[in-house]
């Protein structure tokens, strides 16, 4: 995301607290190119359970690498009776499922939000 911060008061920005209302949960679906490759089937079972639980209460945004992975995840979630009406898939390239580290950082800006984007290097390529 590219945006200008000129003429903006940085003191108006803040991190939302973990307990504040949220619109959705954001996850990246594991695939063979992620750090879960050796345990992919086991990890997918956990993601399916997570997806079914989250969609009982709110929306879920799932990042997938391509259309084939989206179809695969959709089938698994559907079989687990996740509410697919609350799921949004976004296709993007990624090699790390830990979106807390590599995903967007959300800031409150008055009544709105800003997303910060940065280049995550896996702690200087420690695991690359």
Identify the role of each PLM range.
Residues 2-128:
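The feature marks the mature, well-folded catalytic cores of soluble enzymes
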